[in-house]
Amino acid sequence: MKYNSSGAMCASPGGDQPDKHKQPKNGQQPPDKQPKNGQKQPKKQRHTKRFTAQEEALRVEAIVDAKERDMAARGRCERCWHNARDGHCICAHLEALRFRLDVRFVLYTHHKEYYCAGDDAKVLAAVAPDAAEVFVYGRRGDDARLGAILRGPCAERRCLLLFPDDGAATVDSFFAAPGAAPVPARGAAAGAPFYVVVVDATWTLARKMARHLDRLLGGALPHVKLETDVVSVYARTQSKTGRVCTVEAVALFLREVGESDELFRKMVAMVETNNRALKHEYAKRRADLWASGPTMGNPAWYYAMRVDEGVS
């Protein structure tokens, strides 16, 4: 017998024995290759090119350099990443933030989000340049700088990663743990700021980046999740529950640790300002920006509730 194109057995001139040298096209195993004793059928191997750390760093740097050249060619603003040439720059509508708390933000960004106008984390860096800095995952030198900045605060529990994995602590339980340092007020005598790390990427990539941060810092970076009933105003709705954008996550964390409601509202308003620019700049692609589906790629994935426009 032989297998036809549909995987069924058909008559063979050579007799009734299965052809052991030809695999069925639909991926099924021939009878003599079927797993026995309830064993699972082996998965088809995916062949993906693996880069060395140096090759990956060079690849990411080339991607970032190409994006920077494209930004200049298209007339995009280097601060808000919107098209300034066509009048969509939002910098004039962004109010500088003044924090009561002495906090620093590390925006660990995937190169796919870097220089993407729809990304919201860049707005935080634009309005608080002294308190927020963008680091690109995989770019040469960024990991070394990141490690140098965070190792001390991690050792003193003055640092956390907003990341809602299974082992993440709540904000209350993190600060209630022995040795945890409270978020100091700006200008306090101690003079040691508190660091908040956020991963700016799609959920699949964010998990990989979070694991990389754990390796970089020897597992010393605590993971913390938020508990809130506020829903997202982010421009792109999510395919899964538990998603709001980076700026909203930071705003809600700050409110939980004592920042003012006024600053919270200003940060949410920044996301809305970014949304309005997207609605004009990408009017032809609006369906893509607002569609919800299993392949939607954006970094708004922080919470466990249904995501919709508006704030409750």
PLM segments and residue spans:
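Short, acidic/turn-prone active-site loops that include or flank metal/cofactor-
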Residues: 111-112, 139, 166-167, 226-231
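Short Cys/His-rich Zn2+-coordinating modules
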Residues: 51-71
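N-terminal chloroplast transit peptides
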Residues: 1, 8-11
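C-terminal folded domains that constitute the principal catalytic or ligand-binding module
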Residues: 189, 195-196, 201-312
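Intrinsically disordered, low-complexity repeat/linker tracts enriched for polar/charged residues
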Residues: 16-23, 28-34, 39-45
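Glycine-rich, flexible N-terminal cofactor/catalytic loop recognition
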Residues: 67-68, 83-156, 181-186
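S-adenosyl-L-methionine/SAH cofactor-binding core of RNA-modifying enzymes
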Residues: 127-215
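Short cysteine-rich clusters marking metal-coordination/redox-active sites
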Residues: 77-80
